[in-house]
C-alpha cells in the first residue's frame, strides 16, 4: 500500500478471506529508512483465524416453536469464542439449509423465523448485536433427527468479499404424544346402551396409534385431546413401546392382560397393531415409550378412550347330581320317589372363558353377568333298556327350588342348584326282563338357547353354540327293583286266630323271571303300612260283628309279615288288606290294573268246591 503525505502515523485495514498468516514490511520509503521495521508482533506477522457460527437448537417438540435460540458469529479457533470483529451491530443475510438424518427422508421443512428451510438455501436477514449474537425461532412439524446449517458469504457491499462463514447443529424433534384409537364406541363404562359389545376376551382387535405434534402446553395426553386437530408426525419411529391396560369397569375387577405388551412404531401416518385383552369389562389402553429411548430423549405416550365392552369368548358348563336309595341304603322300588343325595342335588356351574381357555374372572361381577337362569329339559333315562328308557317311563314330582350362588366373588362363575324334586320309574304293569334290578341312569340336558347369554356368549367351542348334557353319578346312586306286597289266603276254625301271610317280593332274574321275597327291604314298616282293614264279608261275618279292630298287622321283617285275625266264633269269610300300602308295592292281581293286595280269610269248616257231575258223550 502506498502511504503519501505529511504524517507521522496512519491507520489502515487489511483482510484475508482464507485462514493463514501475512507478514508486514516497508518495501521502500522516501526518504529512505535508516533502521529496520519495528512491529508489535514478532516477525511482523498477522495471523488470520477461521470464523463461523455457533448455535444450539434444543430438543424440539413437533409443531411447537422454540424461540430465543442464540446464533453467534465466532472465531472457531478461538477457545474463548470471542466475536469476530465486523459482525457487531450489523445486519447480514445468512443462507440456511436443513437435512434429514434419521430418518433420511421427510416432507416437512424446518421453520426458521417462520420461513421454511429445506435442502435448498433460504436467505434470512439477521441483525447481530454488539456481541455478534442474533436470536432465532425454530419449529419443525415432524419428528426425527435433523441438521440445520447456516452460511454467510461476504459481499462487496459489506466489504468482505471472499469471506465464508458457516455453522450447523444436529437436533432432535419428538412428538408431543401418542394418539391411541380403536373401533370401540363405548362412551359410558358399564353394561348399557352406550357401551355395546366390542370384542370377545382374548380375540384380537386393531389398535391404531399415531404420533402427533404439539397444540397447547399442558394438554392432557388422552385420546380426546391428542386425536383431534393435531398434526401427525410420520417420521417418528421407535421400538419396544410399552402397552398396558387399565380396568375401568367393573370396579375392583381383574385387570387382565393386554397382549402384546409392547409394539414398535413404524414410519408413516399410523401404526396398527393387533391387540387383545384377556378379561371381560371396559378398559383404557396406554402406550409408554421407554425413557430416554428416542435419541436420548423421552417421548410422552398417550391414553385411549374407553375400550369395550369385552365379553367371554364362550361359556364353560359343568354339572353334577346323584340319587340316593329310598328303601334303606340298598335300593329303591319302581314307582318309589328317589331323592337327590344330600349335597348332590342337580348343580350347574357356568363359567366365562376367554379365547385362550382362561377364566374371565370379571364375568360374574354385577351386570357383566348376562346369562338368564338356565331352564333344564326333562330328565331322561339312559339305562340302555328299551322299555325303561322310553319317554314317560321316568317321571319327576315335587317342585324344583332354585338356589343361585357365586355372584360377585370374582371367579367368573355362577352356580345353579335345583332341589325339592324326586324322580321315579313308572312300575311295569307286567314284568319283563328289563325290570330285573337295574341301576338308575339319569341324564339331564340344557338346550343351547338356555345356555346363551343376552350378548350371544354361549356354551360351545367358541365358534358355535351347543346343548349340554350330563349323566348322574352312581355314587351313591340307587338300584331300582320292581316290587309288590302280597297277601296270601288262609282258612281255619272260627274258634282260632287266623294268619294271612304277608310277603314283600321283588322281580328277580331267577328261573326265567320270578318274584322272590325281598329280604333287604327296610322301608316297608308298620308306620308306612298303617292300620289293616277288612272288607267283603260273607256268611255270618259282617262289619258290625267283626270290624277292623279284629285284625292286627305283624310288620314285615326281612320281607315277611302277616295279618292276624282274631277268632270270630262264627262262620264266614272276609278280605284283609292294607289300604295305606304304597303304590310302588301295588300289582295287577286281577287283570284290572295295579292295586293293593288283599287276602281272603275263611272261618269254619271248608266244604271244598261244589259237587259237579261230568258227562262225556262219544260219537262214532
Where are these regions (language model features)?
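Core sequence-specific DNA-binding domains of diverse transcription factors
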Residues: 1, 9-620
Amino acid at each position: 500500500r502506498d502511504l503519501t503525505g505529511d504524517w507521522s502515523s496512519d491507520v489502515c485495514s487489511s483482510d484475508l478471506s482464507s485462514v493463514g498468516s501475512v507478514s508486514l514490511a516497508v518495501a521502500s520509503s522516501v526518504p529512505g529508512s535508516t533502521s529496520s521495521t519495528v512491529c508489535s508482533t514478532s516477525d511482523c506477522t498477522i495471523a488470520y483465524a477461521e470464523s463461523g457460527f455457533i448455535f444450539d437448537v434444543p430438543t424440539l417438540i413437533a409443531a411447537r416453536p422454540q424461540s430465543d435460540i442464540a446464533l453467534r458469529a465466532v472465531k472457531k479457533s478461538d477457545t474463548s469464542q470471542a466475536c469476530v470483529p465486523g459482525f457487531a451491530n450489523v445486519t447480514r443475510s445468512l443462507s440456511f439449509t436443513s437435512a434429514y438424518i434419521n430418518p433420511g427422508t421427510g416432507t416437512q421443512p424446518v421453520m426458521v423465523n417462520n420461513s421454511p428451510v429445506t435442502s435448498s438455501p433460504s436467505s434470512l436477514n439477521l441483525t447481530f448485536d454488539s456481541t455478534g449474537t442474533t436470536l432465532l425461532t425454530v419449529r419443525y412439524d415432524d419428528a426425527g433427527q435433523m441438521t440445520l446449517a447456516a452460511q454467510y458469504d461476504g459481499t462487496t457491499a459489506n466489504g468482505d468479499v471472499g469471506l465464508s462463514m458457516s455453522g450447523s447443529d444436529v437436533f432432535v424433534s419428538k412428538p408431543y404424544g401418542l394418539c391411541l384409537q380403536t373401533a370401540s364406541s363405548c362412551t359410558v363404562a358399564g353394561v348399557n346402551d352406550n357401551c355395546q359389545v366390542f370384542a370377545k376376551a382374548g380375540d384380537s382387535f386393531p389398535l391404531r396409534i399415531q404420533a402427533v405434534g404439539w397444540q397447547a402446553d399442558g394438554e392432557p395426553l388422552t385420546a380426546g385431546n391428542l386425536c383431534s386437530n393435531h398434526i401427525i408426525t410420520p417420521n417418528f419411529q421407535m421400538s419396544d413401546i410399552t402397552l398396558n391396560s387399565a380396568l375401568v369397569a367393573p370396579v375392583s375387577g381383574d385387570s387382565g392382560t393386554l397382549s402384546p405388551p409392547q409394539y414398535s412404531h413404524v414410519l408413516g401416518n399410523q401404526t396398527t397393531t393387533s391387540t387383545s385383552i384377556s378379561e371381560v369389562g371396559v378398559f383404557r389402553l396406554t402406550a409408554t415409550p421407554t425413557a430416554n429411548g428416542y435419541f436420548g430423549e423421552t417421548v410422552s405416550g398417550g391414553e385411549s378412550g374407553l375400550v369395550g365392552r369385552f365379553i367371554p369368548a364362550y361359556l364353560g358348563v359343568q354339572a353334577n347330581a346323584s340319587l340316593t336309595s329310598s328303601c334303606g341304603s340298598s335300593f329303591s322300588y319302581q314307582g318309589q320317589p328317589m331323592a337327590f343325595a344330600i349335597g348332590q342335588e342337580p348343580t350347574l356351574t357356568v363359567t366365562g372363558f376367554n379365547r385362550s381357555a382362561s377364566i374371565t374372572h370379571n364375568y360374574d361381577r354385577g351386570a357383566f353377568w348376562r346369562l338368564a337362569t338356565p331352564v333344564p329339559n326333562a330328565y331322561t333315562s339312559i339305562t340302555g333298556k328299551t322299555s325303561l328308557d322310553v319317554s314317560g317311563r321316568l317321571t319327576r314330582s315335587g317342585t324344583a327350588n332354585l338356589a343361585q350362588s357365586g355372584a360377585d366373588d370374582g371367579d367368573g362363575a355362577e352356580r345353579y342348584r335345583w332341589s325339592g324334586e324326586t324322580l321315579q320309574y313308572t312300575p311295569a304293569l307286567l314284568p319283563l326282563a328289563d325290570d330285573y334290578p337295574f341301576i338308575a341312569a339319569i341324564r339331564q340336558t340344557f338346550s343351547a338357547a338356555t345356555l346363551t347369554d343376552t350378548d350371544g356368549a354361549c356354551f360351545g367351542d367358541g365358534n358355535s353354540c351347543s346343548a349340554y348334557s350330563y349323566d348322574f353319578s352312581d355314587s351313591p346312586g340307587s338300584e331300582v327293583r320292581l316290587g309288590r306286597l302280597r297277601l296270601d289266603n288262609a282258612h281255619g276254625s272260627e274258634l282260632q286266630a287266623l294268619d294271612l301271610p304277608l310277603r314283600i317280593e321283588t322281580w328277580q332274574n331267577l328261573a326265567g323271571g320270578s318274584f322272590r321275597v325281598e329280604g333287604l327291604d327296610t322301608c316297608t314298616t308298620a308306620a308306612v303300612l298303617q292300620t289293616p282293614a277288612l272288607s267283603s264279608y260273607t256268611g255270618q261275618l259282617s262289619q258290625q260283628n267283626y270290624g277292623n279292630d279284629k285284625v292286627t298287622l305283624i310288620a314285615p321283617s326281612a320281607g315277611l309279615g302277616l295279618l292276624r285275625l282274631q277268632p270270630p266264633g262264627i262262620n264266614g269269610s272276609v278280605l284283609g288288606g292294607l289300604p295305606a300300602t304304597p303304590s310302588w308295592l301295588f300289582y295287577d292281581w286281577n287283570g284290572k290294573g295295579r292295586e293293593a293286595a288283599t287276602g281272603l280269610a275263611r272261618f269254619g269248616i271248608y266244604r271244598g268246591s261244589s259237587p259237579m257231575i261230568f258227562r262225556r258223550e262219544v260219537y262214532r
